[in-house]
Regions:
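Alpha-helical substrate-recognition element adjacent to the catalytic core
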Residues: 32-239
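Short, flexible segments with low predicted structural confidence
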Residues: 4-5, 127-128, 263-264
Length: 359
């Protein structure tokens, strides 16, 4: 009798939906289907999307010879221009340094000459079209290290988020902190649902990246970027190996650049921090080629690499001719090309429109 009551109770719970979230307790006709989440609603049908879905379906199928176990489903994503805007009018971290050095009343009078020169080069580039100096990625990195030196990590996070809350220059209906490519966020959702772990591997400052992607649920321990040396707030000049940090000390940014995370440095950081070769890689520039090639050299698993091209002059501040030339280059290198103009139904979402820059 007790067994009968237990079975009846289990049936009632099942029918009430407490033990399942997929169906109610009923028979389905042959033509009825269970609702499944639809991904990629912001995409048009295109080669790149077809290739991505075919790849994921293959490597997640236990019966496939290309099956990849979940712990090895590693995907790496560049940030600027790959899933975050970079044409408003330049990289977020370039805009931030320009503001910090030339407009922020709390710092502009303190900026060293070389930092001021770097910020002015950015302003001349975005406002007057003057070419940036050679090797400006390193010039900027060294200037940025100095410009934010002395800030605690909490102070820097708040500073980045305050600037990110400003309206994105060249657009209406969007702040810098909202400037994510909606179709690429759907890629994150799709990969997560299929057992992939994805990492941000950016040339931008690691802590800037962390502040920006927090809002879309990417944890800070899956963010790799440019690094500066940190010290404890009471450490002074003593080496970390000799100093014991106390319980109520903060971590402070210094002016010492450790690494600019571009090109082969991305590969080195992936190896050191992730410890596995990615099977999927997404980027948009030559700074991502080494990461892509590392992924495609994976001799254990089938792999794939994707490059976005900024070819949409109607919805973004793009250079279509330059983008198409890059697309040919990426195709020749064996990467799948994602056209923002042809493949995306929307870039930033409804209500966002491109307008002229204002300075």
């Amino acid at each position: 009798m007790k067994k009968t009551l237990l079975w009846m109770l289990a049936a009632i719970l099942t029918c009430s939906g407490l033990t399942t979230t997929l169906t109610s307790c009923k028979d389905y006709d042959d033509d009825e289907t269970i609702e499944v989440k639809e991904y990629f609603t912001s995409w048009n049908k295109c080669e790149a999307l077809t290739a991505l879905k075919e790849y994921v379906e293959d490597v997640t199928n236990p019966k496939s010879p290309n099956y990849i176990s979940p712990e090895d489903r590693i995907a790496t994503f560049d940030m600027d221009g790959t899933f975050v805007g970079e044409l408003y009018p330049s990289y977020f971290e370039y805009n931030l340094l320009e503001y910090r050095v030339l407009d922020d009343a709390t710092y502009r009078d303190k900026a060293p000459d070389d930092v001021r020169e770097a910020a002015q080069a950015i302003r001349d580039f975005v406002r007057n079209g003057k070419a940036l100096p050679d090797h400006f990625d390193m010039i900027h990195a060294q200037a940025a290290a100095k410009a934010y030196a002395g800030m605690t990590l909490a102070q820097f996070d708040a500073y980045v988020k305050a600037y990110a809350a400003r309206p994105a220059n060249g657009f209406t209906g969007m702040t810098y902190g909202q400037s994510f490519y909606k179709p690429m966020l759907e890629v994150f959702d799709y990969l997560k649902a299929n057992g992939f772990t994805y990492y941000v591997v950016s040339g931008s400052d690691r802590f800037i990246c962390r502040s920006l992607v927090e809002s879309i649920g990417i944890p800070s321990n899956r963010v790799i970027g440019m690094d500066v040396k940190l010290v404890s707030s009471k450490q002074g000049e003593e080496a970390g190996v000799n100093y014991t940090m106390g319980q109520k000390e903060d971590l402070i940014r210094t002016d010492e650049l450790i690494i600019k995370n571009l090109k082969t440095n991305k590969v080195l950081q992936i190896s050191q921090e992730i410890g596995k070769v990615p099977v999927l890689s997404f980027g948009n520039s030559s700074g991502d080629q080494a990461m892509h090639n590392y992924c495609l050299s994976n001799d254990k698993y089938r792999s794939a690499a994707f490059m976005l091209i900024a070819d949409d002059e109607a919805r973004d501040h793009a250079n279509r001719e330059k983008a198409l030339n890059l697309g040919q280059k990426w195709n020749a290198a064996g990467y799948h090309v994602i056209s923002m103009r042809d493949d995306f139904k929307t870039i930033y979402g409804l209500g966002v429109q491109k307008v002229e820059f204002t300075f």
